[in-house]
Amino acid sequence: MAESITYFSIDVEASGPVPGLFNMVSLGAVPVHHDEDGQWKPRSEEFYVEIKPAFEGFETEAMEIHKLTKEHLDANGVDTKEAMEQLNAWTLDQAQKTRAVFVGHNAPFDWMNVAYYFAYAGLKNPYGYNALDTKALAMGKLDLHWLDTNKERLAELLPNLPALDTEQVHNAVYDARYQAILLCELLNRPK
């Protein structure tokens, strides 16, 4: 029998392309579980944190994407260790006795940031060294080319996936919830 899992749809916003030189500025997460009908479904719970900058790097282009300013993060962000302790505790509480599986839309970017920040904070990564990428999953499930796996195209192909709210895109918790819905649409499709 397969091990019970809880998927965690996670989205990261950052001040640049790599952690350590640049900052993870916000993180959103939404758990996904099997419902009583055996379908994958996002839970109503969510996690969101804005993180105080720990590194000097800030690319103008990256900062324009999510609209969080260095000044806002300096004043309102949570310290790195505290943010990662909060995420760890929340993840363990949501996963309970299941295995926590990291999911991202372009998971390598998001996982890289989260894994780095757990290590930087001196904490064990509750998601381990594995991640599920919804772009790759969409390629397989829908027989798509990589370039056709963006969220806009997937919203056209998956009738139950809502259109993106352009006012909320690049808010980490909005993106995490949207990705959770996308994950469920892909996982619940017939084989």
Language-model regions: role of each:
Residues E50-L73, L132-A176:
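Active-site-proximal helix-loop-helix substrate-binding element of RNase H-like nuclease domains
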Residues K81, E85, W111-M112, L132-K135, ...:
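Non-catalytic, well-ordered alpha-helical scaffold segments
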Residues A2-P108, L164, H170:
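Conserved non-catalytic scaffold segment of RNase H-like nuclease domains
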Residues V101-P108, M112-N113, Y117-F118, N150-K191:
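Acidic, Mg2+-coordinating catalytic module of metal-dependent nucleases/exonucleases
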Residues A2-S4, A14-M24, G38-W40, T98, ...:
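Catalytic phosphate/metal-binding cores of nucleic-acid and nucleotide-processing enzymes, i.e., regions
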Residues L27-A29, A83, P126, T149, ...:
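Residue-level signature of transmembrane alpha-helix interfaces in integral membrane proteins
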Residues V30-H33, K70-L73, L123-Y127, E152-A155:
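Short, surface-exposed linear patches
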